[in-house]
């Protein structure tokens, strides 16, 4: 049981890491070619990586919540709290980047696509 849960955690971690690398490469290439503005590229990459990571956080243990017992229910509740914090943080981040960068439409379209 423990080995299975650890293996699921490892595969999820690997998928999250590969997606984050792909997003960063794609976004970096697009931003350098279009605007040559690296800060917006980094912000959007971190945003998408965090959003993907914490949206799949509840899937780190498999099975239904009633089958996994008290520990899994506690982690599910914790993940919802973390999701809310990340969502509020990304809203704040969107306002900050929209204030300081002139390329607001790019960030907004990319963020809407990820949500």
Swiss-Prot record:
Coiled-coil features, chain-numbered ranges: none
Subcellular location: Membrane
Residue ranges of the TM segments: 41-60, 81-103
Cellular component annotations (GO), alphabetically ordered: membrane
Keyword entries, A-Z: Membrane, Signal, Transmembrane, Transmembrane helix
Bilayer topology annotation: Multi-pass membrane protein
Described purpose of this protein according to its UniProt entry: Has a role in meiosis.
Stated name of the protein: Meiotically up-regulated gene 106 protein
UniProt signal peptide: 1-34
Highest taxon above the source species: Eukaryota
Gene: mug106
